[in-house]
Amino acid sequence: MRVRKPAVAGYFYESDREKLLQQLEWAIKHELGPKAPQIPKLGAETLGGVAPHAGYIYSGPVAAWVYSALAGFGKPDVFIIIGPNHYGIGAPVAIMKSGVWETPLGRVEIDGELAEKIMRYFKELEDDFHAFSREHSIEVQIPFIQYFFGDVKIVPITIWRQTLSTSRELGKALANAIREYGRRAYIIASSDFNHYEHHDITTKKDEMAIGKILQLDETGLFEVASKFDISICGIGPIGALIVAAKELGYKNVTLLKHATSGDTSGYREETVGYASIIFYR
């Protein structure tokens, strides 16, 4: 059995189980956090949302928002976690269709059945364990999932070829696979927003991009990111989620929380933007 060991425990989040649980509780109760492990659900059903993936001390309170909102809709059978490939390792679009991911909170199993269905609808997806070896954008979501939902399966997908066409193909494949799967699946698009500019600039750039997400406009998202140099590291995963949402009839999108690393660290000269966004109907 393939075991993906933690790559950033002790760096992005606490490596000790009890300290990690305390850190997750801190994120929830933080002044920028949701304050509660579950907020009232916004609609009848959810498809998932966008969550940041920086170190918990920076983005944890914002990330807690989307998981608190998802918890209001109940526990899914599986989380599909789509992240950017920051290191360019492995296949252009990679998936793991078997094995487990390990964190200080325990192991989560990959849902091979759903992974196979996604691969059948998107032929360019490659089963590539190596592509995930260092990638933190997926890893940092898993302790949140374990804390809020307990034992639940995952399907990890990572993208370094972040084009609009890739997002569309993947989004349609996800929609088709979820329909065929017939059980409850939530998608997490793991992404930070603008990088390494002053808090005020990052905030304004982020707002332009978030506006397109709220309009379910994947084309507009890619266009504003290019035109205004908005460095959204997970634009491909977000685009795929938007496409899947439209295919499956999830037409409501709500921004739960937007902040920058300047809000959590106090250093506002070079910041990274974070947003929690939920898709529902």
From Swiss-Prot:
CDD domains: MEMO_like (cd07361)
Gene3D superfamilies to which the protein is assigned, alphabetical: LigB-like
InterPro entries: MEMO1_fam
SUPFAM superfamilies, sorted: LigB-like
Family: Belongs to the MEMO1 family.
Protein name per the record: MEMO1 family protein Pisl_1105
Species of the source: Pyrobaculum islandicum (strain DSM 4184 / JCM 9189 / GEO3)
